[in-house]
Amino acid sequence: HLLSRRQRQMCIRDRPYTVTFDDGTPKVLSNILIGELWLCSGQSNMEMPMKGFKNQPVENANMDILRSRNPEIRLFTVKRTSTLTPQNDVTGSWKEASPATVRDFSATAYYFGRLVNEILDVPVGLIVAAWGGSACEAWMTADWLKAFPDAKIPRSETDIKSKNRTPTVLYNGMLHPLIGLTMKGVIWYQGEDNWNRAHTYADMFTTLINGWRTEWKQGDFPFYYCQIAPYDYGIITERGKEVINTAYLREAQAQVEHRVPNTGMAVLLDAGMEKGIHPPRKQVAGERLALLALTKTYGIEGVNGESPYYKGIEIKNDTVIVSFERAG
């Protein structure tokens, strides 16, 4: 942030760097790049690696893994950590993109970073802090959750019933150590676990975004997110309970894009699976998030990076005409 645009471009071209710290005992960091850093968070559809989950592959993953060698894309996965106490450090290490590293890395994040790197021709760093099945509440602080009385925070670690759903535990364990890290923005893929609490999601997600921005003290940084893809949630609904229409959750997600500045939503209505909550088309998710970043954050012109948004309907005799905004 202290360098001019021309100075940054010069730094990017003269890569990689070696950085030496010396307080009497030298510490050398080698193979350092200067580029764009994005935080990638959410639940299993953000966490899902390029190699896929058991019996749940990622579309075209084999060929994309084989072609993934690119020292200008750097990958960091935050180790799963669930706790009621805010942490100051995380476990993990930076790795260059290669078949051996990409196969275990978030598919959505990788496809996002690959396109951003390709179009901008600058190094891209990706930090993934995600946990499958995690609730929105888990990525928030106790103060932010005061407005949501249904979010119950345990008194002690032994009272934690769910390591990935309990309010505050993933914010404390996986996000708090990253606060203050200079980054360009966030991509987010979450909402499936909140599908049956859609009535609070728009307010809660808005609170999360504003809270993260307040903690980071880097202004209204870009925050782009995926709308949940189609899936038959009756499969995971308890016997005897009513199946809740997930259109309510998607509507809540759509509201956030219009109430919170510098956000954008990637629609995935054409990229889901009726019987699979982890759709294989992760390239669609990652690249739609990248299109948002490229057009809204980096100013790339000539393409429409935003997903179509419902505008209204008109009924003429026996015909219903549906109109959309941003349908280019």
Summary of predicted features, one role per range:
Residues E36-L37, N70-E72, L120-G125, L181-G185, ...:
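Loop/turn elements at helix/coil->beta-strand transitions in domains of secreted/extracellular proteins
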Residues H1-R8, I12:
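Single conserved hydrophobic/aromatic residue that forms the stacking wall/gate
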Residues R165-P177, D203-G211, V243-Q255:
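Alpha-helical scaffolding within the catalytic cores
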Residues D14-G24:
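Short, aromatic- and glycine-rich surface loops/edge beta-strands on solvent-exposed regions
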Residues K54-P99, L120-L170:
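Surface-exposed loop and adjacent secondary-structure segments within mature catalytic domains
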Residues L249-G328:
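Catalytic cores of secreted or luminal carbohydrate-active enzymes
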Residues T25-E36:
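Edge beta-strands of extracellular beta-sandwich domains
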Residues I127, I228-L269:
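Substrate-gating cap/lid alpha-helix
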